[in-house]
């Protein structure tokens, strides 16, 4: 496997070329990926919000936003700006500290999780050993924030919504983790880079989706539930709980929830594409094609092409999944809380366990195909 | 010793400002976690004294007013408003007028069920059908606009002894077009909704009303027919010209929200059937050259015959409601809509009691809400089909 482009090294070397000491060059480098990631995630959300509005409009035979920018692409920006300038209302008798802390606790872990999302061999902020585990760990912080804001709002709808959010997140974290565990077992690593590497080489045929046909369904259902998307949007079920834990929020605090939920959706889609759809991997094994054509893998234009293609592939795959999630949201009704919990505990959990066991058995029986 | 957690019941006030309270219904719900322990509906936020207003209006003054009872079904209100003095004063209605009335009522039944379907689906979480039903309902409103000049309410179309005006030229063809267009759309709804597993799990076995309960609580309309009672006033009372048309009473035996859904969907199909037959069987034919024919053929023209008129007699402003009392009812989209009228040989009715279907159907709500989940409140309330304008009047 070629290492491809290493941006960090090239950046550091070019700075050192200007005569900067290596330590200072490193200091310049440190904030760059984080800023890039925050901008990337936010722009990703704007695109998803626009997609959501346009696709829902198409599903409902409406036009959707059309005046703010061409085809209404600036509508999410306009909405965001509006929310920034709105008054920040804290209801009387609410707990102002918890009320403020809640949205922050929901948003921060989601952005942090972007640390481990790879867009290419070296296009990742940190390739840590526990990569995918970090995502699971961080995603269980969000329900604390939801519960906090639901409790602090001094509103019964908020409280019910917060409790629902907590119950839902806890129930669906377990099948989610078990589905991820099966992948980890096949990849022999928790690192997201290794997980993609292990899938690449055979094009579309090597992707985990073929080896984990049950696992990817479990993961998708659980991920939808974690993102609180319909059919699992019970914590904010408009018809039942008005807006759930968001009921009392306005302005920027509401925007944080909104942002958080969409960033989470993009993140889940990205993680799904990394775990099951081969991440940045192209459907055709391009390296073999390059070899066959006689182009050396170290050729610079090939590396740039591959990196660009890698980013495009990751984003394309995720947006395909987001499209499915949006279409699902505007098609299906909402499940009831007891049905939701039954599905999580009585169906997904045993199936995920069985899936894990079968994966382990297959790994022992066919070490070649299942990453022995 | 056994450790147990004791929770205090939570009293939750739902409405009158709540996204799914169908107007201004207020429910005071007692919750034990997610389970409903008790529910107390509070009504009256939309009370406008419709009955008292009727006592100081002549019928022709009152007709434009009545579509505000049940603003999803204005034609039914107008129909019962003119039926009451008609029945009391024994006014005969020409056949042609009866057929026009039946078409309007059935169009209204479709519009009513459509406006039930959208919010009901929204209540169980699916927002999209709401937009589809508006698409079809608009066409019904276009037809009404062509006939009466108004769309949702204020049609002001029914008159004692017939209807205000004859149908305009080409209206029957347009109505036929609507029927052709509408049936595939119902199939589309059914494809999207009926066999959706999430929808089925949300509505099947939820809010079950047994046959005995349905009768004892005085339910009517799809609420009653969903519980296995084959009771439809169009068949029972033989009013207008429903007897001359071939159609079936749709009913289900399960008595749950899904049964009510099925009944309403099938009633829409049945209404289309009725409209199609009525368009064909309308005396005087579809084209409105009757006036020209009458002029051409003179006084002895067969088109001058009573049955070919759209109104028996223009109601005079001084039409006096004869002394006496009568209870007149018809089958609206929501059930039995009735008027208890007391005349005093005066232009105004002495008493005008409105028996609205959804007010009576709503009574059973607290009874069937006991023990269900919070989310079921909306599904059950949605399946009852209430319009607060009609409940509070």
From Swiss-Prot, chain A:
Pfam families: NADHdh (PF00146)
GO molecular function, one term: oxidoreductase activity, acting on NAD(P)H, quinone or similar compound as acceptor
Keywords: Membrane, NAD, NADP, Plastoquinone, Quinone, Thylakoid, Translocase, Transmembrane, Transmembrane helix
Example of a GO biological process term: photosynthesis, light reaction
Primary location class: membrane
Membrane topology, as annotated: Multi-pass membrane protein
Catalytic reactions of this protein: a plastoquinone + NADH + (n+1) H(+)(in) = a plastoquinol + NAD(+) + n H(+)(out); a plastoquinone + NADPH + (n+1) H(+)(in) = a plastoquinol + NADP(+) + n H(+)(out)
Segments crossing the lipid bilayer: 29-51, 98-120, 130-152, 165-187, 202-224, 254-276, 305-327, 340-362
EC id: 7.1.1.-
Cellular-component GO terms for this entry: plasma membrane-derived thylakoid membrane
Localisation: Cellular thylakoid membrane
Function of the molecule: NDH-1 shuttles electrons from an unknown electron donor, via FMN and iron-sulfur (Fe-S) centers, to quinones in the respiratory and/or the photosynthetic chain. The immediate electron acceptor for the enzyme in this species is believed to be plastoquinone. Couples the redox reaction to proton translocation, and thus conserves the redox energy in a proton gradient.
Self-association and partners: NDH-1 is composed of at least 11 different subunits.
NCBIfam families xref list: PRK06076.1-2, PRK06076.1-5
Similarity annotation: Belongs to the complex I subunit 1 family.
Name of protein: NAD(P)H-quinone oxidoreductase subunit 1
